[in-house]
Curated annotation (Swiss-Prot):
One of its GO terms (biological process) is diaminopimelate biosynthetic process. GO terms for molecular function: 2,3,4,5-tetrahydropyridine-2,6-dicarboxylate N-succinyltransferase activity; nucleotidyltransferase activity. It comes from Salmonella typhimurium (strain LT2 / SGSC1412 / ATCC 700720). Substrate binds at R104, D141. Pathway: Amino-acid biosynthesis; L-lysine biosynthesis via DAP pathway; LL-2,6-diaminopimelate from (S)-tetrahydrodipicolinate (succinylase route): step 1/3. SUPFAM superfamilies: Trimeric LpxA-like enzymes. This is 2,3,4,5-tetrahydropyridine-2,6-dicarboxylate N-succinyltransferase. Its main location: cytoplasm. Homotrimer. GO terms for cellular component: cytoplasm. Keywords: Acyltransferase, Amino-acid biosynthesis, Cytoplasm, Diaminopimelate biosynthesis, Lysine biosynthesis, Repeat, Transferase. Pfam families: Hexapep_2, THDPS_N_2. Its EC number is 2.3.1.117. It is found in: Cytoplasm. The lineage of its organism: Bacteria, Pseudomonadati, Pseudomonadota, Gammaproteobacteria, Enterobacterales.
Length: 274
């Protein structure tokens, strides 16, 4: 694996000079191998190690290099034709392979090659970009989007129209992460490498970026870029220091543990916030 990484790192340093016409065989094979490993879930752009999320930047570099080494080509779909550098993940799937991998794909859901979809996942008409990782038992609902390199945990529900932001550049930026057993309400947006920790519930229409204040009404603490585990979050506002105006924020209205969450429905958690 180190040899593969070295090839990617070296090629990335001279990426401005690489074209589909002049790319060498070693680089092309290395990039294609990484995309294949991302596609199968054998590698992932970010993973939790000793309780901390670690981003493997060299894998992002491989994804970016894939755009340098490939020309646009016609991609045939059931409803239309497309013209892009990245093939669709399911272009060569037959019924046996869908059965083996054990997920459902409802038309016209679109997944780019290099994204991993785990068993027991359901993809309603939605979009999953290259480098993303969608773990077991997750529902990606209608018109939801999972951006490039985003990491979605087990048993997550991404409701209708949810946007999970992608990140390829700048390289130092971390991917957006939704940990296990989270619920993201309809039309919410989680972007810019925000981490929603395990068991959290995000209400409909909540917008979370790195600059969004995430206010815990029980403690008065303000978080940036991270929703603590077990949080129930709704949209809100915080007043300015001079009291003349207020600005948008997200409000943690309560905390729930796994036992409570298992007994109480999502709607009930969001209704009883007073």
């Amino acid at each position: 694996m180190q040899q593969l990484q070295n090839v990617i790192e070296t090629a990335f340093e001279r990426r401005a000079d690489i074209t589909p016409a002049n790319v060498d065989t070693v680089t092309r094979e290395a990039v294609n191998q990484v995309i294949s490993l991302l596609d199968s879930g054998a590698l992932r752009v970010a993973e939790k190690i000793d309780g901390q999320w670690v981003t493997h930047q060299w894998l992002k570099k491989a994804v970016l290099l894939s755009f340098r080494i490939n020309d646009n080509q016609v991609i045939d779909g059931a409803e239309s034709r497309y013209f892009d550098k990245v093939p669709m993940k399911f272009a060569d799937y037959d019924e046996a392979r869908f059965q083996k991998e054990g997920f459902r794909v409802v038309p016209p859901a679109a997944v780019r090659q290099g994204a991993f979809i785990a068993r027991n996942t359901v993809l309603m008409p939605s979009y999953v970009n290259i480098g993303a990782y969608v773990d077991e038992g997750t529902m990606v609902d209608t018109w939801a989007t999972v951006g490039s390199c985003a990491q979605i945990g087990k048993n997550v529900h991404l409701s209708g129209g949810v946007g999970i932001g992608g990140v390829l550049e700048p390289l130092q930026a971390n991917p957006t992460i939704i940990e296990d057993n989270c619920f993201i309400g309809a039309r919410s947006e989680v972007v810019e490498g925000v981490i929603v920790e395990e068991g959290s519930v995000i209400s409909m229409g909540v917008y979370l970026g790195q600059s969004t204040k995430i206010y815990d009404r029980e403690t008065g603490e303000v978080h940036y870029g991270r929703v603590p585990a077990g949080s129930v979050v709704v949209s809100g506002n915080l007043p300015s220091k001079d009291g003349k105006y207020s600005l948008y924020c997200a409000v943690i209205v309560k905390k729930v543990d796994a036992k409570t969450r298992g007994k109480v429905g999502i709607n009930e958690l969001l209704r009883t916030i007073d």
